[in-house]
């Protein structure tokens, strides 16, 4: 009987301590609400090299915050990582320049980034045309 009472008291104590710890953790996660509404955000600065995880600094009045951000490794540096564009299909190959061109219109500017309304991208013409892949041989009945 004493063992059962001890176990019940121990269980209640453990539950009380864990609920208090969860409450403290939840309150710790909340940051003081800011009355700033006009945040100005800088560009994402990668931690190493020129792409991957990084940080972005924002200011509002006298308050400064840092956010984690990520620069995709396939981004076009001329356009900026915070400018998202909708691109058309690649044009025909220009024989004189040896390049294909396509244009893109601004779809979204993240963090109030200063983006161009339209941009052009170029790439070298491919030397050989791609052929459609054929079905795999040897699979199935003959």
UniProtKB/Swiss-Prot annotation:
UniProt GO MF annotations: growth factor activity; heparan sulfate proteoglycan binding; heparin binding
Alphabetized UniProt keyword annotations: Antibiotic, Antimicrobial, Developmental protein, Disulfide bond, Growth factor, Heparin-binding, Mitogen, Secreted, Signal
Signal peptide: 1-20
Location, primary (coarse class): secreted
GO terms, biological process: defense response to bacterium; nervous system development; neuromuscular junction development; positive regulation of cell division; response to bacterium
Pfam families given in the database record: PTN_MK_C, PTN_MK_N
Cellular component annotations (GO), alphabetically ordered: extracellular region
Family (UniProt): Belongs to the pleiotrophin family.
Protein name: Midkine-A
Species of provenance: Xenopus laevis
Gene label: mdk-a
């Amino acid at each position: 009987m004493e063992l059962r009472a001890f176990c019940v008291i121990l269980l209640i104590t453990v539950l009380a301590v864990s609920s208090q710890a969860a409450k403290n953790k939840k309150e710790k996660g909340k940051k003081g609400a800011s009355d700033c509404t006009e945040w100005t955000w800088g560009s994402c600065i990668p931690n190493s090299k020129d792409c991957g995880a990084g940080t972005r600094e924002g200011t509002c009045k006298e308050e400064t915050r840092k956010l984690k951000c990520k620069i995709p490794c396939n981004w076009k540096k001329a356009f900026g990582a915070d400018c998202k564009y909708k691109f058309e299909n690649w044009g025909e190959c220009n024989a004189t320049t040896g390049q294909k061109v396509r244009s893109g219109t601004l779809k979204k500017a993240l963090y109030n980034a200063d983006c161009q309304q339209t941009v052009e991208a170029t790439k070298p013409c491919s030397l050989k045309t791609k052929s459609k892949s054929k079905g795999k041989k040897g699979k199935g009945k003959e």
